[in-house]
């Protein structure tokens, strides 16, 4: 294990979502947003190969976003607002049916954005849970109230079956590498408001531009 992996803690990942917010919480820096997701996927990998079908999809979406960020128009992808303005004004988004721009930044980020809602619900449930709470139940409830609404039956089935393999709450908290249960709860209480702000702001921008149903 490398030294960076040893130090890996969920707190550092959630801090990326704090670093996202600029201009009085009126914009989101995409580089930090993507880094937050990279950290989350790394965390998910430590839960075992059962989630590899999830991480594969998440990694491919992260890579799409990274290629835009590092590409010739990278500056246009610096923030959420600049990406939306650039892609819409340059006709780079398939609005009703996937055709010429199957992997626009807008549709790719929308998938991550929907997953962020799951994360928000799941972590909040974990924060207020007690020792007897089952992580698989919390995760399933969070999923059913968010991402599941956008997934076909077969994906929902695969996802809910994989949740059964989630470790107990204590093990989960240990993997987070934050400290005692009290410290985990405090850390979640401190960082979740930033995740919520990022989620709410993204939702607002997508809603304003009618982008919430991108194919
Ligand atoms: C901790 C357990 C992880 C459970 C992850 C829950 C999400 C289930 C999602 C199932 C996704 C199935 C794969 C494919 C889906 C795609 O069809 C779909 C749509 O994309 P497209 O291109 O076909 O239109 N993709 C998505 O919906 C994106 C899904 C991304 C999910 C990313 C999840 C990353 C998870 C990180 C785990 C963080 C753990 C947090 C720490 C917990 C602390 C205790």
UniProtKB/Swiss-Prot annotation:
Example GO BP: ceramide 1-phosphate transport
Main location: cytoplasm
Catalytic activity: N-(hexadecanoyl)-sphing-4-enine-1-phosphate(in) = N-(hexadecanoyl)-sphing-4-enine-1-phosphate(out); N-(9Z-octadecenoyl)-sphing-4-enine-1-phosphate(in) = N-(9Z-octadecenoyl)-sphing-4-enine-1-phosphate(out)
Pfam families: GLTP
Gene Ontology molecular function, alphabetical: ceramide 1-phosphate binding; ceramide 1-phosphate transfer activity; phospholipid binding
Compartment list: Cytoplasm, Cytosol; Golgi apparatus, trans-Golgi network membrane; Cell membrane; Endosome membrane
Keywords: Cell membrane, Cytoplasm, Endosome, Golgi apparatus, Lipid transport, Lipid-binding, Membrane, Nucleus, Transport
Cellular component GO terms, alphabetical: cytosol; endosome membrane; Golgi apparatus; nuclear outer membrane; plasma membrane
Function text: Mediates the intracellular transfer of ceramide-1-phosphate (C1P) between organelle membranes and the cell membrane. Required for normal structure of the Golgi stacks. Can bind phosphoceramides with a variety of aliphatic chains, but has a preference for lipids with saturated C16:0 or monounsaturated C18:1 aliphatic chains, and is inefficient with phosphoceramides containing lignoceryl (C24:0). Plays a role in the regulation of the cellular levels of ceramide-1-phosphate, and thereby contributes to the regulation of phospholipase PLA2G4A activity and the release of arachidonic acid.
Family, per entry: Belongs to the GLTP family.
Name under which the protein is recorded: Ceramide-1-phosphate transfer protein
Gene that specifies this protein: cptp
